[in-house]
Amino acid sequence: MLKVLMPTIMLILTTWLTKPAWLWPTMTTNSLLVATISLTWLKWDSESGWKSLNSSMATDPLSTPLLILTCWLLPLMILASQNHMFMEPLNRQRSFISLLISLQTFLIMAFGATEIILFYIMFEATLIPTLIIITRWGNQTERLNAGTYFLFYTVMGSLPLLVALLMTQNNLGTLSMPLIQHMYQMKLHTHGDMMWWTACLLAFLVKMPLYGVHLWLPKAHVEAPIAGSMVLAAVLLKLGGYGMMRLIMMLAPMTKTLAYPFIILALWGIIMTGSICLRQTDLKSLIAYSSVGHMGLVAAGILTQTPWGFTGATVLMIAHGLTSSALFCLANTNYERTHSRTMILARGMQVILPLMTFWWLMMNLANLALPPSTNLMGELLIITMTFNWSNWTLTMTGLGMLITAIYSLHMFLTTQRGLMTNHIISIEPSHTREHLLMTMHALPMLLLILKPELIWGWSYX
C-alpha cells in the first residue's frame, strides 16, 4: 500500500516546489507514474484474496479495481482542469491540485482500509476537499447551495452509521473486515435490530445515491468544476457501493427480507431518473441523473446478495466510473467553447469538431451498454440476478435500459447534429490535450473488454 500512498502524499510537496511554468506537466506526469505503479496491485499471490495485509490496510479483489480507478483518475482530472485553471493566480492553482491529491489520498485509505472505523473516517474525510472544490471553483453562485445540500445529505446519512458501528464493536469486539467475514453473523430479531440494519446501509444509499435521497447529486454535479464532476461520478459514488458490499457481510441472514423495499425503490428509480433525463435541457444535469439510474442498478445488484449480483455491481461501478467521467469531460469541452450547458445552444458540433463527435458517439454507446462493452456485462449480470429474484423486475429493468438508450441517443443527436446556432461565430479547434484525455478514458474501457475478470470482484481471486 505504501508504495502508492507515499508517492501520492509527496505529490503535494512537489506541487508547491515545482517551477510555475512546469507545474501542470510535472503534476500530470508524476500522477500518471503513481497510477502506473498502482497496476501492480492486480497481481494476486495469496489464496485468501487479501494482499499486502497489515493491521490497518490491505487490498483484495473487490477494492483493487476501485483503488486503481482512483489512481488513474488523478492525471485525468489534472489534464481536464488545465484550461479553466490556467488564468487563476499561481497559489490558487497549487491549492487546487493539492486538494485533488489529498482527495486521492483519502480515497486510497478508504478503499484500502481493513478496519471499518478507518474506512468510516476516510469516507467522511473525502467530504472536505470535495466541498471546497465545489464551493470555491464552481461556476455559478448556486454552488454554495449545492455545497450545503452535499454536506447535509452526507453527514445526516452517515451519523446513524457511526452509532451502528459503535454498537457492532460492543457486540462483536472487532471491526476488522478479514475477521468479520469469518465470524458468526448477528441475528436480527427485534425492531431495534431492523433500525440498526437500516442505519448501517443508509449512509451508503445516500452516497450512491438511491432514488429518493438523490437530490444532492444533480446540484453538486452541475455546479462543480470539471475535476469535481469527474471525481464525484467516477469514484465518490462508488464509495457507497463498496461500503454496502463490505457491511452486508455482517448483516446477513435476515437482510434478504429487509432488502426487498430497497430493491424495488432502486429499480423504480431507474425508470424515474431515465424519464427525468428525457426532459433535461442542461447537459451536465442529464449526465448526473443518468448516474443516479446506473447506481440504482448497482444498489439492486448488491442487495440481492448473490455472487452474480456482487460481480455485476462491481463491473458496472468500474465501467460507469470511466463512462460518466468521460461524458463530463465532453460536456466540459462544449462548455469551454460555447459558455453554455444548454444542449440546444451547442448543436451542430459535428461540423466544427468532427473528431470530438467520434468520442461523443463512443461514450454514448458505452453509456447505453452496447455490446461488447463492460457496461453491458455488468447490467446483464444484475438484470439476470434480479429476474431470478422476481420475474416482474424484468419489466422495470428492460424499460430502464430502453429509456437509457433513448436519452443517450437524444443527447448525442442534440449536441452533434442539427443546424448550428447563429451566435457561434468562432470556436477554437479541439486540442491534443482533450484527445489524450478521452483516449485515457477509452483505453481502460476497451482493454477491460478483453480481460473483464480483473473487475469481477469477489468472484475472481
Swiss-Prot record:
It is an enzyme of class 7 (translocase). It is a multi-pass membrane protein. Keywords: Electron transport, Membrane, Mitochondrion, NAD, Respiratory chain, Translocase, Transmembrane, Transmembrane helix, Transport, Ubiquinone. The chain crosses the membrane at residues 20-42, 61-81, 93-113, 114-134, 147-167, 197-217, 225-245, 258-278, 285-304, 309-331, 351-371, 393-413, 436-456. One of its GO terms (cellular component) is mitochondrial membrane. Its EC number is 7.1.1.2. Signal peptide: none annotated. It holds the Pfam family Proton_antipo_M. Coiled coil: none annotated. GO terms for biological process: ATP synthesis coupled electron transport; electron transport coupled proton transport. It is found in: Mitochondrion membrane. GO terms for molecular function: NADH dehydrogenase (ubiquinone) activity; ubiquinone binding. It catalyses: a ubiquinone + NADH + 5 H(+)(in) = a ubiquinol + NAD(+) + 4 H(+)(out). Core subunit of the mitochondrial membrane respiratory chain NADH dehydrogenase (Complex I) that is believed to belong to the minimal assembly required for catalysis. Complex I functions in the transfer of electrons from NADH to the respiratory chain. The immediate electron acceptor for the enzyme is believed to be ubiquinone. Belongs to the complex I subunit 4 family. This is NADH-ubiquinone oxidoreductase chain 4.
